[in-house]
Amino acid sequence: MVTSNTNTQMEVGTIMSVLALCSGTPLEPLPLLYIMASARWAYGADRYLDGKTEDTPESIAAALLTANLILWYTDQSKYIAPEILCILLYPSFKRNLPLLKPFYVGTFWAGAISVVPHLIAHTDVIENETIAMGLLASSVSNIADIEDVEDDIKNGIYTIPARFGINPTRALSAGLFLGSVYKSGVRLPHALPSRHMCRPRFFSSPLSFFRKFPL
């Protein structure tokens, strides 16, 4: 099915930007613009290579150029090659190693959310946050493969849901999500409000009123 995915790409970029802010990326123009451009390039190029989008090569290339110019301007040019190759190598990787496809996606999305934006903003990269984002992206990618099971089987691509079924896929995604929550440092029991009970105080000596009462 061929569709126009500009709105979807904007939604993906927005979600990635929010996740980046949650992982400590400063609220600055360049890191967020890089994330939006990378999402536009990665998602658009993937759909274009699969023949599932009406995007023009020029619009996709413009997004890639924007992301690369930001990397060059902030002295992060060493990430330009991975920015390009991660998408160009993705179709062959998905075909040859389909069971590892969610983790491939998770690795590069973690870099685009929690590593490169931090470097652009000259902020320390937090290891646990990067791992958490990688696990979260892997979980989402794994769930997204459920909708493409029929097409993947027709194309000879046996992803996790195509090989093991829907329920095991959901169980794996749930485990990846819980791992993401754990690595992010969120502790649900401590996040919930606790109840404090007022207990009566007992005195070892009688109150003054009773001390004065004649016995």
What residues fall within each predicted segment?
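Transmembrane alpha-helical segments that form the membrane-embedded catalytic/substrate-channel core
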Residues: A37-L49, E83-R95, G111, A132-V149, ...
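Helix-coil boundary and interhelical linker segments in multi-pass alpha-helical membrane proteins
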Residues: I15-Y34, N68-Y79, I113-I131, K183-A191
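Extended hydrophobic alpha-helices typical of membrane-associated regions
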Residues: T53-I60, P168, V186-L215
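A cytosolic-side transmembrane-helix exit/cap motif
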Residues: Y48-T56, P98-G106, T123-E127, I146-I157, ...
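Intramembrane alpha-helical segments
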Residues: I35, Y43, T53-A121
